[in-house]
Amino acid sequence: MRPMMQHHPLRTLPALSLCCATLIAPPALAQAEAAPAGTAATTVEVTGARFRDQPGRTSLSGAELARVPGAGGDPMRAIQALPGVATVDDSSSEPAVRGSRPFDNVYFVDFLPVGYLFHVGGFTSVFNPNLIQRFSMASAAWSPEYGQAVGAVFDVQLRNPRTDRIGGLLDFSLTGANVLAEGPLGRELSFFVAARRSWFDLVADSAEDQEEGVSFQLPVYTDSQARLLWSPDARYRVRLDFSTATDRIEYTVKAGGKAAARDPLVTGSSNQRQSFATGAVVLENDLSDTLGVRTALGQMRQNDSFKLGGAGTARVRTDTTYLRQQWQYTGWRGHELSFGGTLESRLLDVALDFNFPRCTEFDPNCDISTAPRLFTDRRARQNRADVHLADRWQLNPRWVAIAGLRLQRDSWLDRDAAEPRLGLEYSPTRDLTWSAGFGLHSQPPAAEESFDVIGNPKLAPIRSRHAVVGVSQRRAGGWSWRSEVYAKDFRGYAVADPVLNYRNGARGTAQGLELLLKKDLASGGPRQGWGALTGFASLTLSRSRRTIDATGEQFPFDADQPVIATVVANLPWNDRWSYGLKWSAHSGSPYTPVIGTNGTWPDGRVRPLFGGLNSQRLPAYHRLDLRADRRFTRDFSAYFELINAYNRQNVAGYSWNAAYTERETVEQLPIFFSFGLQLKL
């Protein structure tokens, strides 16, 4: 099977289903990205508006991101084109940011937490693309408002409902359809309701890889969002927000195939299901011209379950109730103050009957058939609280100082933390800004690592230090550029332990240089033709390493890609047509090679002998995506995409036979065509 980013058992084992799916029919699955967009003039706006109180941030317009070629109209899929973001496989857009893992990130949508942001391993996001107004990413030393993460903070802003009339949208693509209805309900009330369902499972019932002996049902996903907004005046707003997402995939491993021969216990039917549902009431009140507050009270339920052949079943249900509040005060001359806090209570319900290999990213030899069988069915309550304070101080017209502090308490781990965040900005001219930031961050261990019976309740959090220095400049004609140098270290990664199940026993480092060159529409310039060409080019040079404390062994991080380059261009040719391209390339991802055999397992299977952890690399990756948008009428438009236009045979990994004597290459997406239609109502 291909290398996988996620190694925690309750995360990794369900991901086998996604691996099987992408090995068999990657073109069909990748088309789940599709969502149409119009053909208006396109620029990709990269600013720091949402995280302007800290360096190391990027903000992008959702409408513009939706037209990045290869994203299928989904703004969130386009984030992989940003500097510092690594993805190891075409089948997933889940981002590994600046040397951290995808599950080291935290996600918020309009001040509210969400269960997950991407369907079925990252093929498409869980929010209607027509609702996404802005996307922001903080990748180092971010504001103390955000915690419980050492990777990055993703903050999505949805637009409010229209208030002029009842209207909507219909979106159709090769893989699914979504519908949006919105409008006013009187003078002070407005609403939107959106729903989406994939339909490639209705077109192709199943697929099979005969050599691997795996047949599967194509994955099914749904999502929905709803908002009821009450705005009695310009200073006071109350909204009710709801969102849901579901994902399901099923497959069967047949006896006699390669997959069953390598690990017999996976033989039989398997499935994975995940879902979340969240609802919240949010009050936003501008108490004066200098003081504002927003408060959110909400609840979220997450369900994750899977069955893996004869290896067993697992179910995890999490019910979270939270209260968040954020104050903003600008009445103190030269200061922008932000302060608030969060109370969170989480009920974790775990039922497990499974051969449980305690695999982490530090264990290449993960065999399910020989793993111990574990049973548990119990609940646990986790309570967390935090307070934070930040000040953006305009020292003079050129200098800005930023200081913040986050205090948090975790009753589950019985630990307290104080995390300072510091920043400095210097603008010698109106268009040139130097910035620097430093922050301490922490993240609790994964639930399966700290849950008793299967984990270690005494695990300490992962801790990280972030430092970043950057410079940005705006130039004439719509040109701008930005560069950042960053360094991160991570301490307290969990490793398997035969007595404690897990212990804190590994650390990591990440350093890099990022460069972004961007072209926007020039003020007063043409809006069509070659003079309206916009886009950006990004380059990341980085190094990410992991170290096992007990042995001192060092090796590259799973998503270590020393060179990442991306070019995105958009050309609004006329009122009806616009064109775009995206070319991306990166160093091959590291993997742990099989260098021979090492006897047999107790059941007689050949036992592989692995080389050094991540000691070899896949071939370099590169791909070209093309896009054309066509507006037929004011309300009807379409897009057409050619993915992997020159049919580069990028390598996803390698598959071995049961004797580990023959290796086959597993390829990523071939060339394929996709399209989508949009009708405004």
PLM regions: where:
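Periplasmic N-terminal accessory/gating domains of Gram-negative outer-membrane beta-barrel systems
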Residues: T47-S143, V153, Q157-N160, E514, ...
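Transmembrane beta-barrel wall of Gram-negative outer-membrane proteins
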Residues: S173-R197, E212-E250, N271-V293, G331-L337, ...
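Flexible loop and strand-edge segments within Gram-negative outer membrane beta-barrel domains
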Residues: Q217, R237-D286, L297, R301-T320, ...
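Membrane-embedded beta-barrel scaffold of Gram-negative outer-membrane proteins
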Residues: R294-G298, D304, S427, W434-S435, ...
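Surface-exposed extracellular loop regions of Gram-negative outer-membrane beta-barrel proteins
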Residues: N303, D349-D367, Y426, R430-V468, ...
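C-terminal beta-signal and adjacent terminal beta-strands/loops
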Residues: L533, A585-R605, Y621-R623, D629-L681
